[in-house]
Amino acid sequence: MTNEEPKRTLVISTIENGTVIDHIKAGEALTVLRILGITGSTRECVSVATNVSSKAQEKKDVVKIEKRELKAQEVDRIALVAPNATINIIRNFRVIEKKGVIIPPVLIGVLRCPNPCCITNTNEPVMSRFEMHGKKAVCSYCDAVISSDISSHII
């Protein structure tokens, strides 16, 4: 008998091709799924692990999506709710690309302006445009500020 702690393993099946989103803030995996438009009727095989022990964070969430690689705009949206996330591209069971997410300084067509009178919320064909100032997003058209609950403004 030893004093060593038993080894703990995370058992989520590996994927052959697709994307693994790791180091999501604990409790945000379902928000990430919503951002990606993944619902119960989605055709992709999706694995979700929540509140998993982590060395880098106390707890984390992980999302694995078979046969799908994320678009840049999807990664930008994920960065808003999971700024420490890592995106792993998997091909033939191997990680071929691994990168952290970065919140871009300007977000176009990613957030909905909270100002109902903003030109982006009218019938005009204008995409929203926000500049990031720390954790605040400022509308480039009307100067409305989103400083909390940014995930509820993601388009």
Swiss-Prot record:
Keywords: Metal-binding, Pyrimidine biosynthesis, Zinc. One of its GO terms (molecular function) is metal ion binding. Contains catalytic and regulatory chains. Binds 1 zinc ion per subunit. Belongs to the PyrI family. GO terms for cellular component: aspartate carbamoyltransferase complex. Its cofactor is Zn(2+). The keyword Metal-binding applies. Involved in allosteric regulation of aspartate carbamoyltransferase. Zn(2+) binds at residues 113, 118, 139, 142. This is Aspartate carbamoyltransferase regulatory chain. One of its GO terms (biological process) is 'de novo' pyrimidine nucleobase biosynthetic process.
